[in-house]
Amino acid sequence: ADIVTTDVWTSMGDEQENEERKKIFKSYQVNMNLMSKAKKDAIFLHCLPAHRGEEIDDIILDSDFSAVWQQAHNRLYSSMALIEFLLSDQD
């Protein structure tokens, strides 16, 4: 894999399912074992907020694999451009 990505296991509003989902998805955590199966120069992405120790291991989130902070930074500018486009006078 060139890119490894994940999201939170429990969405906002579904907190009552959190403990059950942790049990079900534990084997899908992005950690060094999983990243070792990806390409040497693979990157890790996450839409944030991340739950450290659940869907993502601390080591990966803070590693050279992680492009999470750049992804978040880019999302800011993508959102700004979309808002400008939607609010602009379209002919």
What are these regions (language model features)?
Residues D62-D91:
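C-terminal helix-to-coil terminal segments
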Residues A1-I59:
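Rossmann-like adenosine-cofactor binding region
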